[in-house]
Amino acid sequence: MALTVNPHAGPSAPDTFHEEALYAFRFDLNCDSHEDVTFKVQFGASAQVDGNEHQHVQAFDVCRAIGGVARKGAEGELIISGHTGQVVKTDGDYRAYAGLAPDLFAGDAVALNVFRKALWKEKRFEPQAFQSRQNFFAKANVTAIVIEIPSPLIGRGLVHGWATASLYGHAPEVQVSRWGLPLITHVFLSDPALKDEAERYNRATPADDVTLFSKPISDFTEKVTRLANSAANPSEYANQILARICPTVLPYELDTPAYFNVARFNGRALTDDVMGVILTLATHTALGDGVAPDKQLLRPDFPYFGEPHT
């Protein structure tokens, strides 16, 4: 399991983890959109490495929580402790890494903004927006958290996962970000008339998704397919997409190869072109932005992210 935070870490964003934050990987085992098993990660204060103001190290702990404590708070069984920038291995075949890494996400963010402006302000479908084929995230770094554990510590068979970041320290716990399926706020919840929709989504849970976000997701899909003239019945197609992506959790059959494609979601590999998949599903056309994750930034073994850009 892997999550990344601090886009463009280094020059314009922190290269450390928030010491009053709780990062979590959450798994629903029975399809009720509530977590049953959670892996919680917390970090200590940052310190300079050998007096270098551009390099920092933090201690971190990973806890596994089940049942009621899986949903809230930092409680759980401590399974891994270590320091950032180093791969941590335990006798139980657990591995963890937290630290600077290359951003493996690929997408033309500028083109997506042009596409959305045409859709919402000019009420037209503009696939030509993606002709520039520029990866906005090329040569960017992030801070990554990567954990590898025996799959029985999660469960068996089909699970549904998502990750969250919450403020957690002196103040009460407040969730500020969540990720399950990619690009939900950037594509399906992008209507500028829906103010603060992204923030509302990031503070919600998957159990809230059907109630809170069914209508805007359906409205977006129906609108874009109608403008693109790509669905015989835009309303019916919107309902099909809604059934597939809401709640916005990532399905995965444990111990099988991960892949995220138009036909099916089964986890998500680091090299999957998720921007192209989501654009294709949202518009019901073979639409992509012409860029894909750079496989040269991977390493074959844990933590799978290669060396950060310098």
Predicted regions: what they are:
Residues M1-T310:
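Surface-exposed extracytoplasmic segments
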